[in-house]
Amino acid sequence: MKISLVTKEWPPQVYGGAGVHVVQLTESLRNQPGVNVDVHCFGGPREDAFGYITPVGFENSNAALQAIATDLAIADKLSATDVIHSHTWYANYAGFAANLLYGTPHIVSAHSLEPLRPWKAEQLGGGYRISSWAEKSAYEAADAIIAVSDGMRADVLSAYPNVDPAKVVTIRNGVDVNKFAPNKDEKVLEKYGIEGRYAIFVGRITRQKGLAHLLRAWKKVSPDYGLVLAAGSPDEPGIGKEVADLIFELQATRKNVWWIKEMAPHHELTALLTGAELFLCPSIYEPLGIVNLEAMGCEVAVLASAVGGIPEVVADGETGKLVSYDATNSEKFESDFTNAIEDLMSKPDLLEKLGKAGRIRAKEHFGWDAVAAQTVQLYTKVLK
């Protein structure tokens, strides 16, 4: 059975959870008997994938048009495969077009939904209408849709009522607990000048990740606690400036706020996570949140917003704490987040207990081999 995975992100250009998912899923699928996987990605040639550059004439076009043009180039090369599996709206249209051209079954993995991310218009401009159209077209025509959480499955059916519920299945993301494991390399902390007790945020600078909410919440957190921000790649200048201004405001009065703008190498990332007593995930939209699983793999307690699929990962009171989010009352969310940080950081013994329980939960319930096996079952089903 030949499977073609289509993705925008592929090493070395992996910047989000969807990219991590594709890399780990590909590795695990290749360990499944009888499965042959190739990868078609954006960003130019790769040694281990078919990489596509933006077609000539579209180099200066809106990002959404660039994606559609690249998708058509990819679709042209998907004639000789058994199943096409696309990830994110950037790649969905390639699978949609190839399905029309060749009749090849197309499966979509729902990592996020354009109708639930209106702030993407800040990044794409009018291209947001194109991305929304491309996603809608692909979802409604897909042979199957993989939702990365039950929450995401409900969102798919709500956003796209024309989709047959029988086509939408939940297969949650996984985490490699061998790669994300406790790493007590203090030299990494020394490199960044980090000392003392601290909490950590890891993620892109986008409205979705709620970093601005966290920074406003941190203003009222005791200065005894440090904050590490592994945060870069702003979606657009507006959110980039807002976050930078908030960070500089904190750093003006505190010496224990560290901003790591570049993507840290894996070894450094696990050391930064392990050194933290609390992982912070203030997302306002999160279909599952692989980053929480990565923190749990490193035995770090998680404080997260109770949105999307996060409650399916973070067991409230067992591996961390959840804070309700209401888009109409951001001040309450920030205040509640402040209080939760203060409460948890004042209980180091509890944090250690939550962290150890988190690794156990990640290991027992979120292994990639199980994800791959379930995915292969779906491939087989759409081929019948």
What kind of feature is each model-predicted range?
Residues 284:
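Aromatic "clamp/platform" in nucleotide-sugar-dependent glycosyltransferases that forms part
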Residues 271-276:
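Short alpha-helical donor nucleotide-sugar binding micro-motif in glycosyltransferases
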Residues 278, 301-304, 314:
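Short hydrophobic beta-strand element within catalytic cores of glycosyltransferases
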Residues 196, 240-263, 267:
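Nucleotide-activated donor-binding/catalytic signature segment of Leloir-type glycosyltransferases, i.e.
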Residues 86-91, 110:
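Short His-centered aromatic/hydrophobic patch
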Residues 4, 193-220, 228-230:
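Conserved donor-binding/catalytic core segment of Leloir-type glycosyltransferases
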Residues 151, 174:
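Carbohydrate-associated surface elements
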